Amino acid sequence: MALSREENEMLTRVGKGTPGGEMLRRYWHPVGFTNELKNRPVKRRLLGEDLVLFRDDQRRAGLLGLYCTHRGTSLEFGHVEDGGLRCCYHGWLYDVSGKILETPGEPTDSTFYQRVRHPAYKVQELAGIVFAYLGPDPAPLLPRYDVLV
């Protein structure tokens, strides 16, 4: 028996909030290679989400939502500096956990940055591959496949 159009859509969509997407987010996925993480962010698309992969100046890998929380500029064009990734438009600085470290242009006594968090996902590196986990906490252990270790 063939699937209806609606059933096919439900089973094949992997975006956030879809049945397939919510199931697949509970696994680790390869998102890049360690040697790609030089001093520039790298744009990625995983499970229907636009993301940016980078390595900060403390050698930590990070995976953030692609678009700046402030004005929606692509962080693919950001600069890796000062412990995070700085947006090229207004200079907001994000660390690998999505925490906002600096908000240039905001009043010095503003606490706005403390109430806002940028989308960020867990990453781990194994055998030169960067893996990402987009699901809810707690993340499962990253499988140690025998071909990788």
Residue positions per predicted region:
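Rieske [2Fe-2S] iron-sulfur-binding domain
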Residues: 2, 33-149
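A short helix->beta-strand "capping" segment at the edge of beta-propeller domains
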Residues: 26-30
